[in-house]
């Protein structure tokens, strides 16, 4: 029986103040390892995401935008699943840059109106 890769999940809540253009790291980088995101969802809480154009999950080098939740579609309590209306996922099932982790961030500006965003990202870690 193979031991790797194992499916992992990064899940949590980030306050709007943490959804800046720099973002918040949700999976720490690990040298010589490659992350492949295979699914996930996001949900705004406390209001609709405003000011930022979108809330994105990307690699920590900011070269691959994995999940992009359009602000207008991130209304309070609505879960945006991968590739649903308002969520674009062009890098699902694609190995990201070796040694990178994952971050969640606001694009263009810090998120306002919504108080926070819940997230759940399913991913594989390979290499070593």
Predicted segments with their positions:
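Surface-exposed, low-hydrophobicity beta-strand/loop segments enriched in small/polar/acidic residues
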Residues: 1-128
């Amino acid at each position: 029986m193979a031991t790797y890769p194992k499916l992992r999940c990064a899940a949590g809540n980030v306050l709007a103040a943490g959804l800046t253009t720099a973002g918040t790291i949700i999976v720490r980088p690990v040298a010589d390892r490659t992350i492949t995101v295979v699914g996930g969802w996001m949900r705004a809480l406390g209001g609709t995401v405003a000011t930022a154009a979108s809330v994105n999950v990307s690699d920590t080098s900011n070269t691959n935008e994995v999940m992009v939740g359009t602000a207008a579609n991130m209304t309070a309590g609505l879960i945006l699943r991968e590739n649903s209306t308002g969520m674009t996922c062009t890098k699902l099932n694609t190995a990201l840059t070796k040694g990178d982790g994952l971050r969640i961030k606001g694009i263009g500006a810090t998120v306002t109106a919504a108080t926070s965003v819940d997230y759940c990202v399913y991913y594989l870690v390979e290499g070593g």
